[in-house]
């Protein structure tokens, strides 16, 4: 795990004990810090107590709610990014007591700063954006591995960052960073900061689009001038951020990638993946990786689950899981990638319209709506001349689409919505899709 003398002797209150919270508690205790930890789930608290009874007995770990406990001497509140600070009373308490609210990425940044001051040079690549950041992160990580460099992928993807073993000198950290995580980070000076795109998302958390855009922008405002900002300027908000950056600026566009090149990358199809690829290539060039290694890595990249993932084929019909597409801007390039699609969409809507998808309605053989957004989105599509069936559930939609689809057509789950009305997250939705497809006759 990642530990640091920076944390030694400090007193932290960790709020939220899911994977990253548990890893934070472990890293802080191993760094000789004192910890107050809390989660509203009593079973989670019980597991923590069983795991760290010795630390509790020695007074190094206190399981208590910081909202009601004695917090004298607390150095910082370390909050899970899933906790909405704008609606949680911890924000008022922190302001009243003058205690900073940070996240595990900020703890990593402080540890990383200590390493650099003591001669260990490990570049950090931070990737943010509305859509494509997971694929871009994973692709950069894959290219680095193919180049033989020590590298670690973390942040908003994979295992909790503080649970990982630190890299040796010269290793490269590749971090996917959500707007929530950036909000809780104050000293992360990325050697290379990457922006995929910005479209409306998480607006309730950030008080509107401008607040969301500024959260993304902070990653670049934290950079010092010797470092690099790699920004895809295919949208206006990203262009605005590019103008504000004090770092060495590298701008790219999705159309920098030719169709002739992209056809050779089996798991990087569609215009959105052209953007992901050109960003990853720019980062790799900055890090001194050869064109030959980059080219081979683009071909061998296996892709991520639930992102244009080919699930299987039945009677000449291809089934694709794009459950990660939780807004219309993410769904649009998936619809652009194939000419004959049976489109499964719906869930918890993030916007009232599907405007980014309109240009590709001519690719839709039929749409199948599910979940909360189903009736409204069905009406929108009918008004646009798209054939629609209101299915309600994912299982009904998949089975009907499988019956209707003809050879050489595609059944695609690319929902343009969040999943929380019917599933715990987009991963559970994608796994359910896969199980239903596998159970088809």
Swiss-Prot record:
Q: List the disulfide bonds.
A: none
Q: Which GO terms describe its biological process?
A: cell division; cell wall organization; peptidoglycan biosynthetic process; regulation of cell shape
The cellular location(s) given in this protein's UniProt record come to: Cytoplasm
GO cellular component term of the entry, any: cytoplasm
User: Could you say which EC number(s) this protein's record lists?
Assistant: 6.3.2.9
Pathway, per record = Cell wall biogenesis; peptidoglycan biosynthesis
- Keyword set for this entry? ATP-binding, Cell cycle, Cell division, Cell shape, Cell wall biogenesis/degradation, Cytoplasm, Ligase, Nucleotide-binding, Peptidoglycan synthesis
Name of one Pfam family that matches: Mur_ligase_C
Reactions this protein catalyses: UDP-N-acetyl-alpha-D-muramoyl-L-alanine + D-glutamate + ATP = UDP-N-acetyl-alpha-D-muramoyl-L-alanyl-D-glutamate + ADP + phosphate + H(+)
Enumerate the Gene3D superfamilies for this protein.
Mur ligase, C-terminal domain, Mur-like, catalytic domain, NAD(P)-binding Rossmann-like Domain
The family line of this record is: Belongs to the MurCDEF family.
What is the name attached to this protein's record?
A: UDP-N-acetylmuramoylalanine--D-glutamate ligase
- Native source organism of the sequence: Zymomonas mobilis subsp. mobilis (strain ATCC 31821 / ZM4 / CP4)
The gene behind this protein is murD
């Amino acid at each position: 795990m990642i530990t640091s003398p920076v944390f030694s002797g400090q007193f932290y209150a960790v709020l939220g004990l899911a994977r990253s919270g548990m890893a934070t508690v472990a890293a802080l205790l191993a760094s000789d810090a004192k910890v107050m930890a809390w989660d509203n789930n009593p079973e989670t608290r019980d597991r923590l107590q069983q795991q760290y009874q010795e630390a509790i007995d020695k007074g190094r770990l206190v399981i208590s709610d910081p909202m009601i406990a004695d917090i004298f001497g607390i150095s910082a509140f370390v909050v899970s990014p899933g906790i909405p600070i704008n609606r949680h009373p911890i924000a008022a308490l922190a302001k009243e007591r003058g205690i900073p609210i940070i996240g595990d990425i900020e703890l990593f940044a402080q540890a990383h700063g200590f390493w650099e001051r003591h001669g260990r040079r490990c570049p950090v690549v931070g990737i943010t954006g509305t859509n494509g950041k997971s694929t871009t992160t994973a692709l950069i990580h894959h290219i680095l591995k193919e180049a033989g460099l020590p590298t670690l992928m973390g942040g908003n993807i994979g295992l909790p960052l503080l649970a990982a073993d630190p890299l040796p000198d010269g290793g490269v950290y590749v971090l996917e960073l959500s707007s929530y995580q950036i909000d809780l980070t104050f000293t992360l000076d990325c050697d290379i900061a990457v922006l995929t795109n910005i479209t409306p998302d998480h607006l309730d958390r950030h008080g509107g689009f401008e607040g969301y855009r500024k959260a993304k922008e902070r990653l670049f405002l934290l950079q010092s001038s010797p470092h690099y900002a790699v920004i895809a300027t295919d949208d206006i908000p990203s262009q605005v951020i590019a103008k504000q950056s004090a770092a060495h600026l590298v701008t790219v566009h999705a159309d920098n990638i030719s169709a002739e090149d992209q056809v050779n990358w089996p798991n990087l199809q569609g215009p959105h993946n052209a953007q992901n690829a050109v960003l990853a290539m720019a980062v790799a060039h900055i890090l001194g990786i050869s064109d030959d290694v980059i080219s081979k890595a683009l071909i061998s990249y296996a892709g991520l689950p639930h992102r244009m993932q080919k699930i299987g084929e039945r009677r000449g019909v291809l089934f694709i899981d794009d459950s990660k597409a939780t807004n219309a801007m993410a769904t649009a390039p998936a619809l652009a990638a194939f000419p004959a699609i049976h489109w499964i969409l719906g869930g918890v809507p993030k916007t009232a319209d599907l405007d980014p998808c309109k240009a590709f309605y001519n690719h839709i053989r039929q749409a199948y709506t599910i979940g909360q957004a189903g009736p409204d989105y069905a009406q929108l599509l009918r008004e646009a001349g798209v054939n629609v069936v209101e299915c309600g559930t994912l299982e009904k939609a998949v089975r009907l689409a499988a019956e209707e689809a003809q050879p050489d057509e595609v059944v695609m789950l690319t929902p343009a919505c969040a999943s929380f009305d019917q599933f715990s997250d987009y991963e559970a939705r994608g796994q359910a899709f896969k199980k239903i497809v596998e159970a088809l006759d």
